[in-house]
Amino acid sequence: MRVGCGYDSHRWAAKRKLILGGVEIPHEFGLTGHSDADALTHAICDALLGAISEGDIGFQFPDSDPAYSGISSLKLLSKILEMVDKKGFAIDYIDSTVIMERPKLMPYIPDMKSKIAGVLKMPSDRINIKAKTNEGMGFVGRQEGVAVFAVALVKENQD
């Protein structure tokens, strides 16, 4: 078994959609980014890439490449699943924490889990998403952006 850790953060931006875990969440702001700026999916991508020793999302899908401009992060996650499979691993479990002051995410978490599970071809009960605030501290507390941590556990395929 291997473990990978992922982290991502994005600034708030006007005139952008807020997408987390592939789910569009109604909010007055979205997140800045070259892709759809889905910080949750990006952190999960980084955790999976770390677990299979393949760098990070910026290395695999550089923001200097116009092919990734505005791309759905779920498409990137799908490509990473192919890499996991090719390296001889299977995803066992994902745990993540989204840190933002608002909006409240609890109503959207089941849909996020379902979308991520669908892309990763795994049961949604093997994906955990927690939502926390930063109690008014730091850049998250000042509502300048969001931060996400993720951990992925992968195991070698037993062929």
UniProtKB/Swiss-Prot annotation:
Pathway note: Isoprenoid biosynthesis; isopentenyl diphosphate biosynthesis via DXP pathway; isopentenyl diphosphate from 1-deoxy-D-xylulose 5-phosphate: step 4/6
Pfam families, per the entry: YgbB
E.C. code: 4.6.1.12
Annotated a divalent metal cation binding sites: D8, H10, H42
PROSITE patterns: ISPF
Site feature: Transition state stabilizer: H34, T133
Cofactor binding comment, as recorded: Binds 1 divalent metal cation per subunit.
InterPro entries: MECDP_synthase (IPR003526), MECDP_synthase_CS (IPR020555), MECDP_synthase_sf (IPR036571)
SUPFAM superfamilies documented for this protein: IpsF-like
Swiss-Prot/TrEMBL catalytic activity: 4-CDP-2-C-methyl-D-erythritol 2-phosphate = 2-C-methyl-D-erythritol 2,4-cyclic diphosphate + CMP
Enzyme class: lyase
Annotated residues for binding of 4-CDP-2-C-methyl-D-erythritol 2-phosphate: 8-10, 34-35, 56-58, 61-65, 139, 142
Gene Ontology molecular function, alphabetical: 2-C-methyl-D-erythritol 2,4-cyclodiphosphate synthase activity; metal ion binding
Alphabetically ordered keywords of this record: Isoprene biosynthesis, Lyase, Metal-binding
Function statement: Involved in the biosynthesis of isopentenyl diphosphate (IPP) and dimethylallyl diphosphate (DMAPP), two major building blocks of isoprenoid compounds. Catalyzes the conversion of 4-diphosphocytidyl-2-C-methyl-D-erythritol 2-phosphate (CDP-ME2P) to 2-C-methyl-D-erythritol 2,4-cyclodiphosphate (ME-CPP) with a corresponding release of cytidine 5-monophosphate (CMP).
Self-association and partners: Homotrimer.
Similarity section: Belongs to the IspF family.
Designated name of the protein: 2-C-methyl-D-erythritol 2,4-cyclodiphosphate synthase
Gene of this entry: ispF
